């Protein structure tokens, strides 16, 4: 199972847009703010973490397929990679739920 199959097209365009500005963001990260603090782009971090979740899902799928085909893969490795992918996906879903809740709370606030 691939995680990026479940990302809506609107989110894909946002994530793609954020990665197109990497040169500007990298310059900001190395130079820092005027106050001397380093700025970090939330979109890039989110994109990297979603890519890591996707990679874990793909690795678990490949390990499972190799085991099914009879390759020299230990059952423990299959179970560990599958559980790691499952837990990382559950964490990503919970983070998404919290972000949606925070967004909805911001929309409910009156100015």
From Swiss-Prot:
It is found in: Bacterial flagellum basal body. GO terms for molecular function: cytoskeletal motor activity; structural molecule activity. Keywords: Bacterial flagellum. Transmembrane segments: none annotated. The keyword Repressor does not apply. Pfam families: FliE. GO terms for biological process: bacterial-type flagellum-dependent cell motility. The keyword ATP-binding does not apply. GO terms for cellular component: bacterial-type flagellum basal body. HAMAP family: FliE. PANTHER family: FLAGELLAR HOOK-BASAL BODY COMPLEX PROTEIN FLIE (PTHR34653:SF1), PTHR34653. Belongs to the FliE family. This is Flagellar hook-basal body complex protein FliE. It comes from Clostridium acetobutylicum (strain ATCC 824 / DSM 792 / JCM 1419 / IAM 19013 / LMG 5710 / NBRC 13948 / NRRL B-527 / VKM B-1787 / 2291 / W). The lineage of its organism: Bacteria, Bacillati, Bacillota, Clostridia, Eubacteriales.
